[in-house]
Amino acid sequence: IYEKHFRNAREAGSYIIMDNSLHELGEAYDTDRLMYWIHELEPDEFIVPDVWQDYVQTLVNAKKWKDVELPEGTTKVAVVQAHDYASAFECYHILKNHHGYQKIAFSYGADWYAKEFPHPNPLVGKMMGRIMTISKMYKAGLIKDSDRVHLLGCALPQEFSYYPDFPFIESI
């Protein structure tokens, strides 16, 4: 079903972002399987394999994938993974300035977001925690107006109303 959907979307000229299935499977697909589908579907963007809330292993994967050849026109997107704000800041900095990723994503459900913004409703905590994380990185000058940021899903859709003054958020 998914394959047919993506082939139809490609034929219709739709913009395709291919994920690595970390959220659905708990870990990214293996490299050979990912490469097969990347070459079959030729997505516009590909989310390189990351490791949930583990910035060290995510950076190791991102370093490996930065040199992997993908079809022409496919942009590699790296994901910030972390266990707190400091490691998220470092992860974004390294992905952008050392690994050279042109587009970087933020997941929506990291547990530590709720620690940034404690709230009785954990979904509100995660929503506001991601907003605060991105806002603080922008205010600190790490994220620039010209950066390209993708938001991977959301804890609550109300989150998107907080971003109209963030020119770097390119896609959701």
What are these regions (language model features)?
Residues 18-30, 77-89, 111:
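Active-site mouth loops of central-metabolism enzymes
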Residues 1, 14-19, 44-48, 76-80, ...:
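Hydrophobic faces of well-ordered beta-strands that scaffold small-molecule active sites
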Residues 56-72, 77-94:
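HhH-family (HhH-GPD) DNA N-glycosylase catalytic core used in base-excision repair
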Residues 31, 58, 74-75, 133, ...:
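Residue-identity detector for threonine
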Residues 6-11, 62-73, 96, 131-145:
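Surface-exposed amphipathic alpha-helices with a cationic face
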Residues 1-71:
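Non-catalytic, usually N-terminal nucleic-acid engagement modules in DNA/RNA processing proteins
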Residues 52, 81-152, 156-158:
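Glycine/Thr-rich beta-alpha phosphate-binding loop at enzyme active sites
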Residues 32-46, 92-107, 163-172:
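Structural recognition of alpha->loop->beta junctions
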